[in-house]
Amino acid sequence: MSSARRRALGFSFQALLLCAAGWHGAAQADGVSALRDFVQNVQSGRATFNQTVTSPDGAKKKTSTGSFEFLRPNRFRFDYTKPYEQQIVADGVKVWLHDVDLNQVTVRPFDQALGSTPAALLAGASIERDFTLANLPEEAGLQWVQALPKAREGSIRSLRVAFRGKDLAAFEITDAFGQRSRLDFNRFEGNAAVPAARFKFVAPAGADVLQQ
């Protein structure tokens, strides 16, 4: 797998998972309250997304699009459609990263996604235990929340989550190297009837399977 694709999959696996923690809930007085409500009350959901990754100097940007589904506890999938077809599927025990073009699959234990990472929110861990939350000023009609990981050894420098009214609107992560990745969400359905079968992954015939 090329370094560029590995980086794209790595971001998806680690950073996007915060989005799976919750999407749609009752209107809140502030973003922190909305985030807490999402984590506690949203059991499933689906949406489409646009992702933009910006280099530390701001000179280079990469864009991608796809769809997202989750079902608590610990099940989610991301399907990238452009520019490369990729899948990330978690069944509660393992996480499967599938590069369709290369027919290559990387498998990781699910517990590697836990701790002071966005995956902790997906798994239902305590927000205050793993993150320090703070409301940020409103920008362009969006209520922003900052979530700083309490563990300093991870690859995440900071997370920002945005709400528009009662809906999650955007998610932004800055990694340890200063690279910024943002996702904007569309057509979300909260507490949707997502079949459990959507989170069962079988490696395609002939795929190169790498265990990590």
From Swiss-Prot:
Alphabetical list of SUPFAM superfamilies matching this protein: Prokaryotic lipoproteins and lipoprotein localization factors
Which CDD domains does the annotation name? LolA (cd16325)
Q: Which UniProt keywords apply?
A: Chaperone, Periplasm, Protein transport, Signal, Transport
Signal peptide from the UniProt entry: 1-29
* Principal cellular location given in the protein's record: periplasm
Q: Which domain of life is it from?
A: Bacteria
Q: GO biological process annotations for this chain's record?
A: lipoprotein localization to outer membrane; lipoprotein transport
Query: Mind telling me which InterPro entries this protein's record contains?
Result: LolA/LolB/LppX, OM_lipoprot_carrier_LolA-like, OM_lipoprot_carrier_LolA_Pbac
What GO cellular-component annotations does this UniProt entry give?
periplasmic space
Q: How does it assemble?
A: Monomer.
Alphabetized PANTHER family for the sequence: OUTER-MEMBRANE LIPOPROTEIN CARRIER PROTEIN
Q: What is this protein called?
A: Outer-membrane lipoprotein carrier protein
